[in-house]
């Protein structure tokens, strides 16, 4: 899969599947500095992924500050040929001051065995 370099950030397209619905997100950042994969609540609510009383809620911290997130499991998360089923993700506001629909963190990258080729701007 091709990676887009925009404003010094690496963007990919991610396909999320939840309860037989598919959502394609094009403004997703590859973030090797993030331990977990995180998606915008505004975007994933289109799949019916909304907070429920039993969902774990926690605070995550990053360079941009901290925010509260809730956890869900996607039926499948794919970046082109890289795909994981029954994958846990964090969901939060992601109000960072620029368009972003999600972050692909090390949890996904390592479990999927991703190889990032920065010279060719590809991930496989």
Region roles according to the model:
Residues 1-124:
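Pepsin/retropepsin-fold aspartyl endopeptidases
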């Amino acid at each position: 899969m091709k990676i887009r370099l925009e404003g010094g950030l690496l963007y990919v397209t991610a396909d999320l599947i939840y309860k037989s619905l598919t959502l394609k997100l094009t403004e997703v950042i590859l973030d090797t500095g993030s331990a977990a994969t995180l998606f915008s609540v505004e975007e994933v609510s289109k799949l019916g992924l909304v907070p429920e009383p039993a969902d774990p809620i926690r605070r995550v911290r990053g360079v941009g500050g901290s925010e509260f997130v809730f956890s869900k499991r996607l039926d499948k998360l794919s970046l082109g040929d890289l795909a994981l089923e029954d994958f846990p993700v964090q969901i939060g506001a992601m109000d960072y001051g620029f368009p972003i629909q999600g972050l692909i963190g090390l949890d996904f990258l390592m479990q999927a065995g991703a190889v990032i080729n920065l010279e060719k701007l590809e991930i496989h």
